[in-house]
From Swiss-Prot:
It comes from the Bacteria. This is Shikimate dehydrogenase (NADP(+)). The keyword NADP applies. Belongs to the shikimate dehydrogenase family. NADP(+) binds at residues 82, 130-134, 235, 258. It holds the Pfam family SDH_C. Shikimate binds at residues 18-20, 66, 91, 106, 237. It catalyses: shikimate + NADP(+) = 3-dehydroshikimate + NADPH + H(+).
Length: 295
């Protein structure tokens, strides 16, 4: 008789598109681990408390948490790991004997593909586009691992950015800039952008199948702004080569695809749940094949 499998899952809203089940189920199958990963779509934040009480009662081993609940789950947990407490956002929950601990593996996952460039980032400006949990994870990763001279946070909505940073303890590292000023040609914002060693798109704009704005409405794609002294990092992972990354390649910039962060944060979550090391290369191969074929 086969042992029963422990349940892992993703908490979010309208997240049927997620590749997380493929990533974690592939890793578990490769290592022969008794876990199965599924999706839990939660329609409204008022139901989060019920969902987590059910997880405690049912012994669900753990969760990832995604849009829009990374901050909403924080007060519902028993403990917060230090890195999650630093940005008051959780993307991973571990259940041990009914006690739920929240972690944020986005910070480490974001940093991983940049570590080889750490020395060239230290003391230089960087720019992050977006005012959600992903941008805050990038900001904290830069502060922890790379020590840039300043982090320019480019946003559309000034008040949303201020709210996002309300409980963040390191605001002195950040200068908020308006995207509209950048596109209007305001000299100071264009200088901030052009001087940045790293440019990060931490918005979902550019995702395959997403309707609405083109990424050029957020990040300028002009060749004279993107240049070969920059690293351009797009958190969007489908398609693999986003419009932003294609423009960056034409400008001679080094590029980093969102696949790297996706797998980096997943690998850390996987270890927290299972105690094992994810077979990253095999998982990456499977993931890229599925994204490229759309299956």
């Amino acid at each position: 008789m086969k042992p029963s499998k422990q349940i892992l899952g993703l908490i979010g809203r309208n997240v049927g598109y997620s590749w997380s089940p493929l990533i974690h189920n592939t890793a578990c199958e490769l290592l022969g681990l008794p876990f199965i990963y599924t999706i839990f779509n939660i329609a409204e934040p008022q139901r989060l408390d019920d969902a987590l009480r059910g997880a405690r009662a049912l012994g669900i081993a753990g969760f990832n948490v995604t849009i829009p609940y990374k901050q909403d789950v924080v007060p519902l947990l028993d403990h917060l790991a230090e890195e999650a407490a630093s940005i008051r956002a959780v993307n991973t929950i571990v259940n041990i004997d009914g006690k739920l601990t929240g972690y944020n593996t986005d910070i480490e996952g974001f940093a991983a593909p940049l570590l080889s460039c750490r020395d060239s980032i230290a003391g230089m400006p960087v720019s992050v586009f977006g005012s959600g949990g992903a941008s805050l994870a990038a900001i904290e990763a830069f502060r922890r691992y790379f020590k840039p001279s300043i982090i320019y946070l480019f946003v559309r909505d000034l008040f949303k950015a201020i709210r996002m940073l309300e409980s963040y303890d390191h605001k002195e590292t950040i200068s908020i800039c308006l995207i509209d000023d950048l596109h209007a040609g305001k000299n100071s914002t264009r200088e901030h952008f052009g001087s940045s060693r790293v440019i990060v798109n931490a918005t979902p704009i550019g995702t395959r199948g997403r309707t609405g704005d083109d990424v050029s409405c957020i990040v300028p794609l002009e060749k004279n702004l993107l240049h070969d002294s920059q690293i351009v990092y797009d958190m969007v992972y489908n398609p693999l080569r986003t419009p932003l990354l294609r423009a960056a390649e034409l400008a001679g910039a080094k590029t980093i695809t969102g696949i790297e962060m996706l797998i980096g944060q997943a690998a850390r979550s996987f270890t927290l749940w299972t105690g094992e090391i994810m077979p990253v290369e095999e998982v990456r191969t499977q993931l890229i094949r599925h994204i490229e074929t759309g299956t």
